[in-house]
């Protein structure tokens, strides 16, 4: 083995977990990118119309009236998106995809807590990979533009804080 090859092998061996995480993250982004233009029935019949109604009624000013059936925080985020432009399908999906990663990281942290091992890098990386690559997670955010990962992230964080006996934080993230 040449000197350069040895250095490459040593680098890979030292950083295998980080390289694994980067590879999974890259794959997760590519798979989600493939769904960027898919428009589900729910997106057509509800989400796009709600976005347009919020935009037509003045963005943030439209929040005085209920638009759709999502909570006010989600509607506020949608209202902010109306000021950016009219690519609403992408805004819905980007928000949900961002929370896919938050959910995967939260689940991985919680799995590490439950494993009670001192060094649990593998638990973290495997949990992250499993969650971020679940077909239901990918379909919900990247293809359908649904917000399931947003709510699930906060539920996982609630469970994590309850496990740590941080009840005030659990109450805050669940609310």
Question: Residues of each region from the PLM?
Answer:
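Short acidic/glycine- and proline-prone juxtamembrane loop motifs at membrane-interface regions
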Residues: 142-150
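Start-transfer (signal-anchor) and selected internal transmembrane alpha helices
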Residues: 1-31, 112-117, 121-126
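Extracytoplasmic catalytic/substrate-binding loops of multi-pass membrane glycan-assembly enzymes
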Residues: 36-50, 65-77
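Short helix- or helix-capping micro-motifs
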Residues: 124-136, 174-175
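Transmembrane helices and adjacent periplasmic/lumenal helix-loop junctions
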Residues: 147, 169-175
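Specific aromatic-rich, kink-prone transmembrane helix
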Residues: 106-109, 150-169
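Transmembrane signal-anchor helices characteristic of membrane glycosylation enzymes that use polyprenol
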Residues: 11-46, 97-100, 133-139
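Transmembrane-helix motifs of polytopic, lipid-linked glycan transferases
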Residues: 94-117
């Amino acid at each position: 083995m040449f000197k350069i090859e040895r250095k490459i092998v040593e680098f890979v061996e030292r950083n295998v977990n980080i390289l694994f995480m980067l590879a999974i993250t890259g794959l997760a982004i590519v798979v989600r990118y493939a769904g960027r233009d898919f428009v589900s029935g729910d997106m057509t019949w509800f989400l796009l119309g709600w976005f347009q109604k919020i935009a037509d009624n003045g963005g943030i000013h439209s929040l005085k009236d209920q638009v759709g059936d999502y909570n006010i925080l989600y509607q506020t985020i949608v209202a902010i998106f109306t000021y950016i432009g009219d690519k609403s399908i992408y805004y819905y999906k980007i928000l949900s995809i961002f929370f896919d990663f938050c959910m995967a990281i939260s689940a991985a942290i919680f799995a590490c807590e439950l494993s009670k091992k001192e060094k649990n890098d593998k638990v973290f990386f495997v949990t992250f990979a499993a969650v971020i690559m679940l077909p239901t997670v990918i379909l919900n955010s990247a293809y359908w533009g649904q917000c399931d990962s947003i709510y699930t992230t906060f539920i996982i964080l609630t469970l994590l804080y309850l496990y740590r006996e941080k009840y005030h934080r659990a109450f805050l993230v669940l609310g």
